[in-house]
Amino acid sequence: MTETKEEKVHKVFEKISPSYDRMNSVISFKLHVKWRKETMKLMRVQKGTNVLDVCCGTADWSIMMAEEIGPEGHVTGLDFSENMLKVGREKVTEADLHNVELIHGNAMELPFPDNSFDYVTIGFGLRNVPDYMQVLREMYRVLKPGGQLACIDTSQPNIPGWKQVFNAYFRYVMPVFGKFFAKSYKEYSWLQESTREFPGMARLAEMFQEAGFSYVRYISHSGGASATHFGFKKKEQ
């Protein structure tokens, strides 16, 4: 029986969870931290707000957002991998944060009422979901009017030379890193496949608009190795 994308991705993240944080730093040369910081600076996150971090994984972005909004705010992190959440909960406890809740759930059907959150974030997760548009629509639904979505993910450089280097790195080098650092060649081969199939920056911006978002914009990081897309839910008239 053919394995669905959702089943395959779930199996990948359940297996690589113990080494995920270390591999993230190895694969991106620790640039993922810089990309998040650049994104949050542009978001202008307000204190005391309510945040949803979709596909939160091991809670890196959940923790950064919790520190930014302060103790009066609240962050809910959601992921479908219990093993990733287990690592995330340990990190939240270690950081002594009391305004973060990590829950098991599916990004395709967010278990929240409409208009619940001031900010929704998703970092390196959208490319792994079965239906990009369904998840974009769900994130739009749970945003409050005036709320903001920020999505960081890998992208596809257009700079001649760098594009070829980037593609070769993801296709051939990254799985080898996975084999030697995490004993997971097969799983890291899947991650490069999901990166290769993910829409480019301009197309993803169009999808944001199709999902209902306004004032959509995006920035590229590190020559297009990744990109952040921003979108807002219009305030009710």
Swiss-Prot record:
The keyword S-adenosyl-L-methionine applies. S-adenosyl-L-methionine binds at residues 58, 79, 106-107. Keywords: Menaquinone biosynthesis, Methyltransferase, S-adenosyl-L-methionine, Transferase. Belongs to the class I-like SAM-binding methyltransferase superfamily. MenG/UbiE family. It comes from Listeria monocytogenes serotype 4a (strain HCC23). The gene is menG. Methyltransferase required for the conversion of demethylmenaquinol (DMKH2) to menaquinol (MKH2). Its EC number is 2.1.1.163. This is Demethylmenaquinone methyltransferase. PROSITE patterns: SAM_MT_UBIE, UBIE_1, UBIE_2.
